[in-house]
A protein has these predicted regions:
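A generic structural motif
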Residues: 18, 71-74, 177
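Mid-to-C-terminal alpha-helical segments outside catalytic/metal-binding sites
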Residues: 129-130, 134-141, 150-185
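Catalytic alpha-helical scaffold of carbohydrate-active enzymes acting on polysaccharides/glycoconjugates
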Residues: 1-9, 29
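Short Gly/Pro-enriched loop/turn and capping motifs at secondary-structure junctions
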Residues: 106-108, 146-149
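Glycine-rich phosphate-binding "P-loop"
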Residues: 8-25, 147
């Protein structure tokens, strides 16, 4: 099926996730299939939890030619202290140019499914700062996670959080985050 789908110019990769335990990194079939993505210049989107982020780094090490997009800031909970597995993996991600962070899922990380997730960048800065520091302006992309995000905050709030945060980084960084990086990746 991968050969059939990858023949279409709009097919850019696959998204996978939903593991209760670790990623199947040591399974030969899984490794073979991941290598096929890299061979076809396709990306792997990972929908994983904060505790699984170190495994995304291991994939990046094993497959340096594969673009790996980590979805929803790796579903890190919006509370301090941040999980050590997440903070260590964010620091390690700096060394892997094939790892990309989709900055989304922030309001969901608050757990406030009654629509009252906080607005503005300030409540999320302790998550956004280490991500921006590790991934830089070239390896982050915007994601809304709409319509799921609507349970936690209106779309305007979701957009406003990252717009406020990235606006202070300059027009070029903001343009890369919202548009150009996604077009390039």
């Amino acid at each position: 099926q991968l050969a059939r789908f990858s023949a279409h110019h709009r097919f850019r990769g696959i998204r996978t996730g939903g593991w209760n335990g670790g990623l199947p990194l040591d399974q030969p079939d899984w490794k073979r299939d991941i290598a096929l993505l890299a061979d076809r210049d396709l990306s792997l989107d990972l929908l994983i939890g904060a505790e699984q982020f170190p495994e995304a780094v291991r994939i990046a090490e094993a497959f340096p030619g594969l673009r790996i997009i980590v979805d929803h800031c790796c579903n890190v909970p919006v509370r301090q202290p941040l999980p050590e597995a997440w903070t260590s993996a964010v620091r390690a991600a700096r060394r892997h140019p094939n790892l990309i962070m989709k900055v989304s899922g922030l309001v969901e990380g608050t757990g406030r499914s009654d629509g009252t997730a906080p607005a503005g960048a300030a409540p999320y800065r302790f998550i956004l700062d280490p991500i921006a520091d590790a991934f830089g302006e070239d390896r982050m992309v915007f994601g809304s996670n709409w319509p799921v995000s609507e349970r936690f905050a209106p779309l305007a709030t979701v957009f406003g959080i990252v717009d406020e945060y990235f606006s202070v980084h300059g027009a070029t960084a903001r343009s890369k985050f919202f548009t150009r990086n996604a077009q390039r990746i």
